[in-house]
């Protein structure tokens, strides 16, 4: 997208219309592009066809929100953009990566795996997080322990508190991905 102005699909429509106005005999083939950030799922769905799936997940501050991902190739491939649940616009005025989480991204990944996706593409653009993916891993069943052997979900400000990681609870649905 063109951050806060137009999506790549909208830009394609505008450019196609203007080119056709100036060069009426031209054939315009518009191919939207994305960089992995906001709008990437819509571009994949426009180019490859497919289905948009909407679910409830956690936002960067662990509040409930509705976010979506795309399924293409008859559900075999899932396309997820971090921006849909952990994007910069969701940070609001706070914009503090020490307290944000990627937990919602993990929830999207798990949902896609549960629906049978074998390949999961995650676009990392426009993130307001800095938790090293620990929130995402937590949503997928990984446990993080602090020095008191208490489990917690790390964020950018608590990464240094990780003393032990237990992957034994990793979601079984991910085994075929």
Regions found by a protein language model. Name each.
Residues 2-7, 65-75, 100, 122, ...:
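Phosphate-binding glycine-rich loops and adjacent basic patches that engage nucleotide phosphates
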Residues 13-20, 38-45, 106-110, 134-138, ...:
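Predominant activation on well-ordered alpha-helical scaffold segments within soluble catalytic domains
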């Amino acid at each position: 997208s063109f951050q806060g102005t137009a999506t790549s699909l909208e830009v394609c429509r505008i450019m196609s219309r203007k080119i056709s106005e100036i060069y009426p005999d031209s054939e315009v083939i518009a191919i939207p592009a994305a960089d992995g950030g906001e709008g990437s799922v819509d571009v994949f769905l426009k180019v490859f066809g497919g289905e948009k799936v909407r679910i409830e997940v956690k936002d960067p501050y662990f509040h409930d929100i509705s976010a979506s991902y795309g399924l293409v190739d008859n559900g075999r491939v899932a396309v997820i953009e971090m921006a849909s649940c952990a994007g910069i616009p969701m940070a609001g005025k706070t914009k503090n990566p020490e307290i944000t989480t990627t937990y919602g991204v993990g929830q999207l990944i798990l949902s896609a795996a549960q629906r049978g996706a074998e390949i999961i593409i995650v676009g990392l653009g426009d993130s307001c997080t800095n938790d090293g993916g620990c929130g995402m891993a937590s949503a997928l069943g990984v446990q993080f322990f602090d020095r008191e052997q208490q489990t917690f979900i790390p964020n950018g400000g608590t990464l240094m508190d990780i003393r032990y990681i237990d992957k034994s609870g990793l979601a079984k649905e991910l085994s075929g991905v």
